[in-house]
């Protein structure tokens, strides 16, 4: 049996019903115990990111990232890509550095453990 870890806090998940997050972590980070869906594949995100960069409505900076809004509905909680002023910043892996997101998550966790203040952070799986 493989050890599953929460994609927010990194601690082991012992609840058989939990898939990728502790209920408490999900409630704190997403505002709901329901896990939001991110209905995009990597190829779709890359195309959306290109169009947003060309129209100058992406989040500025060196690392590829998008602004996303978390929409809560009766049926499902879902992330949607917005130009600016989203609720979250989604950072994307690149072909050159495919594990950059996991490395940054580790860095944020380590900083928090050292007592440094950080922005809230979590890993979210893409549909692909």
Model-derived segments and spans:
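Regulatory N- and C-terminal appendages and interdomain linkers associated
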Residues: 1-46
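Conserved ATP-binding subdomain of kinase catalytic cores across diverse folds
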Residues: 45-128
